[in-house]
Design a protein with these regions (language model features):
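Contiguous segments within soluble domain cores/interaction surfaces
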Residues: 1-116
Length: 116
């Protein structure tokens, strides 16, 4: 399932497969170009350590480099290991030949426990 949130909050249920569609923006809210990136690592809150998904491992895909749009695929095992809670933050580290940029997605993730 792909998540494209209209309210800015992505909701994930632990133990389900998910694909998050994300847009990187600069400080002014303009699209942050992903053109020329060599790696994108998405780091999500886990119960014991961060859940990392990488472009070079095929877990992150650039959809539109100019628009800053990319997707992060999460397996059921990934979401089961995520920390439950509301309005959590996570980040994406985008690496270019010239250096690394960290994009923070602040208070936009809710992870719920699966109903019994």
């Amino acid at each position: 399932m792909t998540t494209e949130s209209t309210d800015g909050i992505a909701t994930i249920v632990q133990g389900e497969d998910r694909t998050l569609t994300l847009w990187a923006t600069d400080e002014k809210g303009n699209p942050f170009s992903l053109t020329g990136n060599t790696e994108i690592v998405v780091k999500l809150p886990g119960t014991t350590s961060a859940i990392e998904r990488k472009k070079t491992d095929g877990q992150v895909t650039v959809v539109s480099a100019d628009a800053g749009k990319f997707q992060c695929t999460l397996t059921a095992a990934n979401t089961a290991a995520m920390k439950s809670g509301s309005k959590q933050s996570f980040q994406a580290e985008v690496t270019f030949a010239s250096g690394k940029r960290i994009i923070v997605f602040d208070s936009v993730l809710t992870v719920k426990k699966a109903p019994v």
